[in-house]
């Protein structure tokens, strides 16, 4: 049972990679693919912007 779930999960991830879907595209499917990252859908982008703002202040 555990092996079956692992195989299905791996196949699902492989299909996502095959069709070029990234984690951000899954998080914000209505986003324009040519636009920059959406900070509302990508919490990592918010952290990078905050770190960059702190670095500029020092």
From Swiss-Prot:
AXPX repeats lie at residues 27-30, 31-34, 35-38, 41-44. Its main location: secreted. Expressed by the venom gland. The keyword Repeat applies. Keywords: Antibiotic, Antimicrobial, Fungicide, Immunity, Innate immunity, Repeat, Secreted, Signal. It is found in: Secreted. Residues 1-27 form the signal peptide. One of its GO terms (biological process) is defense response to fungus. Residues 28-45 form a propeptide. One of its GO terms (cellular component) is extracellular region. The synthetic peptide shows antimicrobial activities against Gram-negative bacteria (but not against all strains tested), Gram-positive bacteria (all strains tested) and the fungi C.albicans (but not C.parapsilosis). Exhibits little hemolytic activity against washed human erythrocytes. Belongs to the MCD family. Mastoparan subfamily. This is Mastoparan-VT7. It comes from Vespa tropica (Greater banded hornet).
């Amino acid at each position: 049972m555990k092996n079956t779930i692992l195989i299905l999960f791996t196949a699902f991830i492989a299909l996502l990679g095959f069709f070029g879907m990234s984690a951000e595209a899954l998080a914000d499917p209505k986003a324009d693919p040519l636009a920059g990252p959406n900070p509302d859908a990508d919490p990592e982008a918010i952290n990078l912007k905050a770190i960059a703002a702190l670095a500029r202040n020092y």
